[in-house]
């Protein structure tokens, strides 16, 4: 039947959209740069604040040409190089190591059981937001250039440690006729790191100051069935007007510049290292991606600087190094919230995350897997009226199948008339030919939005469902139990759906699509698979309930007129009337 074929084509199109939609709408999961493997930083030899000598730094790599506009020029005859010193700050949230080499941040290690990479493996380690191979541009590396482009202070300037305490450290250097002091301060109440830069020059300065951040990245990895395990690393710049740009290794255009910027830094999907300009000071940003197979990602935030002869200038930069938790970002600065990229499905994703947060907060045992199950139940309750209407329409479609077949035979040579009569029949019986597709059309945006939520929301990072089985809802099911169970429930759902599938090949195709969809889910987040599996279970229960509720009432025998064929009645010895009809009452 034509309507059946149309429904089949629509169903196939929808399933294909499900299969390819994740990769169409979210290419960055497969195409983004991958962070280099983390190395465990050495624990401080002393208490939270240390000033320990370190071995001489090796030669600076090609990435030392950060901020390409600020060319590195000879510095003349340098004075004695001060010893390399490090200072360690430790708060309840982070362990920060500052180095005198360039007066930059050498390590930002997030503390707590949640903040680990490769959890449950031999490579498990605390998350460090500074790449061990980012020596070309450690966070808060500073470059000062004059109006002629000459570098007055370079990225590799050697600083001396002047003073330090439990939450701050000051480094100082003299180079190119400029005295520069950099004071780092950490706040135990949040993930903020502030940097106060003080410049002095006997002959004055007119130019610009750039704060740099870099990381090592590799070329995009993975394919169609790539595991959901990579951690993308990209440079990021909030260029104003809610325009946030990101740049990864392998980008078509390896350089991005914006004349205005609210912050710039390194975005690792769940984590952010960024710096913001001083209040009221205009800033620009520049993002760079060096290398083809692997290389450096460098972000720079540049502000104008003006120092009168014999005078000084102070600039206070606010930085952030931590998880992209909305409340934590807002505690430091509101613009940082723009780093949370929920993409095309942002409105739905924010709603889903809000519902899950509510369930996680109020329902014991405060488990994100349970929150996903309750989210599924809530969505099912909200869509129940539509599901009810859809199933009623499908059951009515089954009941009028004989009439549709008669119309098909009657108007076999007139397709236009056949379609017209079918539509009249649908209208007469309140049947919507597309009714069976509506529930799935509603679920698809939820699937895509939930996938993006799992991909971005740090609340779900390393969030377990059942210990020993699913330790991270943002990663695949390590034992593939959920994808297999999901495939079985999808087949059961098709069996119970009252769709007119008289053609065996159509049923076979439906089962094959369920199997292929399960195969697709093998490498996708277990949280998404848990949602679809729970939705299938609820759909099975709902269909069983609606089949009983919408079951047509039995035909009553009382008062029914039965037509009796006169010839058959005569042969059986009955006494038929002249009209050949008899009324039989129960």
Regions found by a protein language model. Give the residues of each.
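Membrane-protein biogenesis/insertion across secretory and organellar systems
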Residues: 1-381, 553-586
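Core hydrophobic alpha-helical membrane-spanning segments
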Residues: 11-23, 447-450, 484-489, 515-516
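Membrane-interface amphipathic helices and adjacent TM-edge segments
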Residues: 5, 310, 381-447, 491-522, ...
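Conserved catalytic motifs of ABC-family nucleotide-binding domains
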Residues: 449-490
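Alpha-helical membrane-interface segments at transmembrane helix boundaries
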Residues: 356-364, 426-430, 434, 470, ...
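Transmembrane helix interruption/hinge and helix-loop junction motifs
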Residues: 365-367, 519-529
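Hydrophobic core segments of alpha-helical transmembrane domains in multi-pass membrane proteins
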Residues: 486-487, 527-536
């Amino acid at each position: 039947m034509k309507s059946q074929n149309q429904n089949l084509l629509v169903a196939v199109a929808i399933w294909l959209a499900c299969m390819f939609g994740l990769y169409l709408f979210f290419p960055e999961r497969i195409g983004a740069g991958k962070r280099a493997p983390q190395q465990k930083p050495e624990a401080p030899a002393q208490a939270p604040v240390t000033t320990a000598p370190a071995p001489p730094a090796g030669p600076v790599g090609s990435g030392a040409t950060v901020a390409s506009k600020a060319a590195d020029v000879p510095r003349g005859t340098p004075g004695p190089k001060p010893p390399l010193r490090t200072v360690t700050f430790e708060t309840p949230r982070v362990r920060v190591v500052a180095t005198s080499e360039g007066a930059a941040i050498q390590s930002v290690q997030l503390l707590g059981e949640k903040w680990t990479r490769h959890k449950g493996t031999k490579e498990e380690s605390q998350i460090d937001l500074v790449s061990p191979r980012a020596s070309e541009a450690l966070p808060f590396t500073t470059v000062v250039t004059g109006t002629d482009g000459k570098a007055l202070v370079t990225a590799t300037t050697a600083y001396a440690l002047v003073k330090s305490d439990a939450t701050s450290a000051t480094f100082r250097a003299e180079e190119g006729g400029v005295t520069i002091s950099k004071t780092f301060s950490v706040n135990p109440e949040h993930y903020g790191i502030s940097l106060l830069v003080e410049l002095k020059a006997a002959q004055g300065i007119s130019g610009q100051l750039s704060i740099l951040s870099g990381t090592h990245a590799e070329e995009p990895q993975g394919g169609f069935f790539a595991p959901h395990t990579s951690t993308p690393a990209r440079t990021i710049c909030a260029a104003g007007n809610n325009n946030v740009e990101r740049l990864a290794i392998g980008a078509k255009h390896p350089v991005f510049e914006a004349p205005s910027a609210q912050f710039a830094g390194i975005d690792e999907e769940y984590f952010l290292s960024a710096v913001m300009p001083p209040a009221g000071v205009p800033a620009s940003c520049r993002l760079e991606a060096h290398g083809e197979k692997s290389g450096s990602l460098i972000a720079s935030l540049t502000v104008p600087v003006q120092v009168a002869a014999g005078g000084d200038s102070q600039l206070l930069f606010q930085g952030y190094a931590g998880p992209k938790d909305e409340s934590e970002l807002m505690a430091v600065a509101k613009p940082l919230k723009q780093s949370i990229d929920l993409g095309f499905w942002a409105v739905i994703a924010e709603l889903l995350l809000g519902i899950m947060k509510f369930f996680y907060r109020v329902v014991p045992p405060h488990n994100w897997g349970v929150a996903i199950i309750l989210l599924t139940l809530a969505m099912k309750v909200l869509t129940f009226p539509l599901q009810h209407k859809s199933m009623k329409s499908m059951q009515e479609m089954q009941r009028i199948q004989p009439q549709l077949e008669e119309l098909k035979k009657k108007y076999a040579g007139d397709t236009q008339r056949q379609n017209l009569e079918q539509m009249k029949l649908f209208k007469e019986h309140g049947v919507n030919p597309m009714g069976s597709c509506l529930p799935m059309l509603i679920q698809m945006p939820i699937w895509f939005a939930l996938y993006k939520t799992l991909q971005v929301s740090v609340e779900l990072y390393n969030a377990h469902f059942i210990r020993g089985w699913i330790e991270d809802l943002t990663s695949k099911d390590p034992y593939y139990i959920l994808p297999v169970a999901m495939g079985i429930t999808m087949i059961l759902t098709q069996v119970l759906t009252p769709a007119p599938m008289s053609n065996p090949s159509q049923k076979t195709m439906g089962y094959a699509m369920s199997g292929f969809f399960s195969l697709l889910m093998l490498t996708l987040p277990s949280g998404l698979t848990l949602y679809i599996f729970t939705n299938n279970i609820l759909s099975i229960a709902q269909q069983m309930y609606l089949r009983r509720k919408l079951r047509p009432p039995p035909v009553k025998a009382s008062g029914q007129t039965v037509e009796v064929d006169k010839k058959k009645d005569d042969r059986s010895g009955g006494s038929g009337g002249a009209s050949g009809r008899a009324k039989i009452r129960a």
